[in-house]
Amino acid sequence: MFKRAMSTDGPVARTILKRLECGFPDYKNFAFGLYNDSHKHKGHAGVQGNASAETHFRIEMVSKKFEGLKLPQRHRMVYSLLQDEMAQANGIHALQLSLKTPQEYESKAK
Amino acid sequence: MFLPKFNPIRSFSPILRAKTLLRYQNRMYLSTEIRRAIEDAIESAPVVLFMKGTPEFPKCGFSRATIGLLGNQGVDPAKFAAYNVLEDPELREGIKEFSEWPTIPQLYVNKEFIGGCDVITSMARSGELADLLEEAQALVPEEEEETKDR
């Protein structure tokens, strides 16, 4: 049997993309990644009894909206966009974020 | 600012509205007593980490990674305190509201909220974390034994 890659087209992932589009309309102009890492954490203490295959996500996003903001402020922007999904018992359990401005991304890429 | 003040989808869904209400109640749930207990914890050492599990036995990969980073930086154990949120549901929920940060671990240095695992990882990479901890005088002192001239 082939192992199925964790999909990023489940309902939670789709909601994430929708929310990001509202909050950061420019993110599609830049490099972007949404990763579902739930399989790496299957059944560990924090998600026992949570059968959802969409508990652990990783987002790599670039937006001009991050300009002039420190990292915790950038994280809070994304957290507050997704606060409903994170507050639910069966919702997002962990969210890894890499949030850069276009300039930061460019200078890293070179 | 970036979040529309009024989300029409929300107001049409009674389920979502109930959830919002519930969250609001959670927000009220942080009593002065718990707030004070959290403040005491934050003041208990220059470097304070709220984590899942203990430094010896972390119960979550992100808590483990953060402990590892602080150890690599050479944080002085005497200046460090860790609190296991899994032992106390009031702390676990309370700290999220207190810091306005929805995930664990959470790092405080000199009573100031620094961030979670991603923020700390990125600060470690850029050298900011070392600067911050040095400024807070939270690192193990360099070998001073041979220069006892004072």
Q: Which role fits each region the language model picked out?
A:
Chain B
Residues 38-78:
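Local sequence-structure signature of Cys/Sec-based thiol-disulfide redox active-site neighborhoods
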Residues 109-144:
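Non-catalytic, surface beta->alpha helical segment in thiol-disulfide oxidoreductase systems
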Residues 87-91:
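Short acidic loop-to-helix transition motifs that present clustered carboxylates
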Residues 49, 70, 80, 104-107, ...:
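Structural signal for hydrophobic/aromatic residues that build the beta-strand cores
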Residues 34-36, 92-94:
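Eukaryotic intrinsically disordered and solvent-exposed regulatory patches
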Residues 1-33:
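N-terminal mitochondrial targeting presequence
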Residues 97-102:
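Thiol/disulfide oxidoreductase modules built on the thioredoxin-like
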Residues 81-86:
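Residue-level recognition of beta-strand->loop/alpha-helix junctions
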